[in-house]
């Protein structure tokens, strides 16, 4: 369906990152678009849905996109594919082939394509806006799966060259993008992630907190970490730091780790076995969105010893809940935490252990961090980020041929 060239342009959204289970990328895209959808004067939005041209029935994926469209105030635009979904997804997973159908090639009329997961359609000549979360594929290439590394190296430079505007999630990533690709300042917009302050807050109802304790078998005090289990999150050193805590501290505080299974995490499980911590480190698996806030709030300490972050969403969530945080100064984390968190050296398990013990053993420091966290987190709001996105789309609209 063609857009009216005399009216506002349509925003066409590539939804690949927003299928469940949501990662940080999918959560950012969904919440940002939800906030954008209620702004006055916003552009119409359409979610792209691909269907094999011989297929007529609605798939489960299409039904989910209809639900997502309702959440973000969009409609669904079905595009016909020339290959069944199984073949299409195998091509998407290959770093040697284009990840998008050929119907996203060529000019696209009075519309702006929004690609929330780094890469845009390589053959597209329409106005487009991608979102870049970090440059880990350049800074920590060994931490990625080989196919993901090759995919980004092949397609991201093309996307950046053809983009009308580029969204990044921190000033740190803006600087890195400019240094790596010589992109003009005016082409990049920093749009911070945020949290739902009605969910992530210190005064979460006691019944919600008790429910997650029962669900995840956490009856007493615990330390908490949440992220996909992958090398940049530095979980092996977190486990080594936990082992360095005094025995009475470990006996009082099990370490609960939540997050998707990830990749290249063999060193984490090897460290747990080597240190004999099988009964003290508890893996909770992927956590549904509704459980994140009460789990954060109930934790006595949140720890994220990342080697590199484009932002650090779990740090912000813990701060908003009033939970003390120990993290690192790597990547964009200081933009998030400021002086409301405690920083450790991610390469030194003794440093991580020392800061964890300092927070756990100092009630005055804990009270200060618990008070400072929500105040700092209050500056990150989806409404403000959505207004920034509106400005990006309005600027991109002026580039439509």
Question: What does each of the following model-derived ranges do?
Answer:
Residues 1-401:
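Carbohydrate transferase catalytic cores enriched for Leloir-type hexosyltransferases
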């Amino acid at each position: 369906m063609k857009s009216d060239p005399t009216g506002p342009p349509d925003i066409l959204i590539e939804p690949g990152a927003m299928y469940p289970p949501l990662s940080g990328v999918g959560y950012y895209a969904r919440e940002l678009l939800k906030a954008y959808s209620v702004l006055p004067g916003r552009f119409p939005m359409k979610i792209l849905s691909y269907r094999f041209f011989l297929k007529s029935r609605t798939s489960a994926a299409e039904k989910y996109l209809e639900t997502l469209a309702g959440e973000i105030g969009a409609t669904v635009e079905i595009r016909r594919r020339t290959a069944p979904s199984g073949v299409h997804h195998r091509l998407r997973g290959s770093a040697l082939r284009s990840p998008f159908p050929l119907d996203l090639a060529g000019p696209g009329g009075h519309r702006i394509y929004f690609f929330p997961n780094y890469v845009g359609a390589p053959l597209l000549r329409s106005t487009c806006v991608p979102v870049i979360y970090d440059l880990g594929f350049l800074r920590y290439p060994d931490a990625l799966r080989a196919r993901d590394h090759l995919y980004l190296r092949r397609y991201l430079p093309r996307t950046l060259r053809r983009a009308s505007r580029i969204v990044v999630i921190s000033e740190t990533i803006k600087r890195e993008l400019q240094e790596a690709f010589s992109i003009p300042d005016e082409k990049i917009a920093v749009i911070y992630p945020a949290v739902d302050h009605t969910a992530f807050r210190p005064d979460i109802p006691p019944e919600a907190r008790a429910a997650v304790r029962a669900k995840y078998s956490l009856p007493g005090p615990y330390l908490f970490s949440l992220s996909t289990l992958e090398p940049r999150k530095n979980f092996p050193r977190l486990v080594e730091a936990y082992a360095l805590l005094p025995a009475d501290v470990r006996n009082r505080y099990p370490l609960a780790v939540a997050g998707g299974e990830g990749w290249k995490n063999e060193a984490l499980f090897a460290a747990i076995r080597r240190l004999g911590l099988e009964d003290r480190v508890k893996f909770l698996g992927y956590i549904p969105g509704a459980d994140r806030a009460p789990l954060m709030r109930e934790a006595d300490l949140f720890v994220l010893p990342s080697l590199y972050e484009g932002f650090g969403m779990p740090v912000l969530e813990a701060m908003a809940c009033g939970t003390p945080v120990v993290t690192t100064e790597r990547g964009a984390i200081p933009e998030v935490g400021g002086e409301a968190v405690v920083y450790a050296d991610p390469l030194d398990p003794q440093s991580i252990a020392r800061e964890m013990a300092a927070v756990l053993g100092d009630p005055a420091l804990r009270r200060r961090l618990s008070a400072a966290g929500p105040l700092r987190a209050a500056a990150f709001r989806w409404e403000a980020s959505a207004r920034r996105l509106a400005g990006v789309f309005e600027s991109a609209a002026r580039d439509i041929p």
